[in-house]
Every structure is written in C-alpha cells, then in structure tokens.
Amino acid sequence: MAFVKSGWLLRQSTILRRWKKNWFDLWSDGRLIFYDDQNRHDIEDKIHMRIHCINLRVGNECRDFQPPEGKQRDCLLQIVCRDGKTVNLCAESADDCLAWKIALQDARTNTGYVGSDVMYDETAISSAPPPYTAYATPSPEVYGYGYGQYHGAYPTVGPQVFYASNGQAYDVPYQYPYHGPYGQPPANHVIIRERYRDNDGDLALGMLAGAATGMALGSLFWVF
C-alpha cells in the first residue's frame, strides 16, 4: 500500500464548528485518514473515497460554512458522504487546495491510483505474495505411425462388369490394392490384343481372359 498525498489541512469540527489542524494521509486504495498530528498516533476519522464519497466541492461550491480567519474562500474543500455527513476542510493555499482536489477526485473515481510522490507502507512490503497455484502438466499425446496403424475400411466397390460383343455381361470381382507402408506403387496396366475372329463368343472370352490376367499381374506388381 502507498501514500498518494499527505499534508496538513484545517478541519471544521461537527459540533462546535471550530477549526482544527489535522494531518491527512490519502492512500492508493482510496482511504483518506486524518490524525491528530503527523506522528499518526491518534486517528481522528477516516473516509473511503470510492465507497463513502458522492461529491467533492471546492471554493465557491462549498456550502453552509465559511473559511477560517485569514483564509480565502478558494482554499475551501468539502467532502460529501453518502450518509449525509460532510467534511469541511481548508488548505494552506489555493494551489494546495487544487492539488488535494485532483488527488481526492482521482481516488474517488479510479480503481488504482498511485501518485508521483509515493511512500510505501512497511506492512505492505513485509506481506507475503499470494500463494502460487501449481497447474498439472498436460500429458503429451502419442501418435503412432508406420505399418498397421490405419484401421479404416476401404470404400465398398462393386464388381466390374464387362460386355461381350453379343451383349452378354460378365462380372469380375474388384480386387483391393495393398499399399504397404510406403504408399501406393504406380499401377501397371496390361493390355492383351487378340486377333480378330469371326466368332463372337471367342472374342468375348478373349477380352474377359485379358482383363483377368491384367488385374492379376497388377496385384502381383503392387505387392513387390
């Protein structure tokens, strides 16, 4: 915790309306504490600017009180609290009053204010930092690569249909290729040309035999 501003101010008592000199400390958390003297032994009163203060008046804005003898009205400062209480103050000069107004206004509106002249509280320095929260280290994910790691199914493909010249259809089962651990090898296509014959049945059987032989040889090349 740190002091934002400290100094002497005249404060008017609530009952006898007499002016008394008090030492004021404005903390960075918004607390305004005033003591009997600068030794800070006896606390006269305290106000939390962000919680209790609803208005801050300066100079001619101040109401229901007059400055002490020998002081100008532009030295006056009035703090209005939520419960209706007012704290009537008088600074040493108009410039000092303006400096207090700026510091108090910032303490009332800002969540964390630290002034230029900062003095640190010994209790804040000696306090321990917040406890460290340990987080568990996430376990690394293991991914397997290599042979036999793919468990997906090949897409279903129906049998291949070949038609002879007479219109008769022949079904040949589709053979799934084996890719192995090094990917799919280049396909080998085998084309067998038969001599033209007048017999349509012999031509169809030749085409069917050539297709079956090509697929068998292609599967053999894929394996190697």
Swiss-Prot record:
Major localization listed first in the record, in broad terms: membrane
What are its GO cellular component terms?
Answer: membrane; recycling endosome membrane
Q: Would the keyword Transmembrane helix turn up in this protein's UniProt record?
A: no
Q: Where in the cell is it found?
A: Recycling endosome membrane
Membrane topology, record value: Peripheral membrane protein
Gene Ontology biological process terms in this record: regulation of cell differentiation
The PH domain extends over: 2-109
Q: Which InterPro entries match?
A: PH-like_dom_sf (IPR011993), PH_domain (IPR001849), PLEKHB1/2 (IPR039680)
Which PANTHER family does the entry mention? EXPRESSED PROTEIN (PTHR14309), PLECKSTRIN HOMOLOGY DOMAIN-CONTAINING FAMILY B MEMBER 2 (PTHR14309:SF8)
Q: Per its record, how is this protein called by name?
A: Pleckstrin homology domain-containing family B member 2
Q: What organism is recorded for this protein?
A: Gallus gallus (Chicken)
- Gene name per UniProt: PLEKHB2
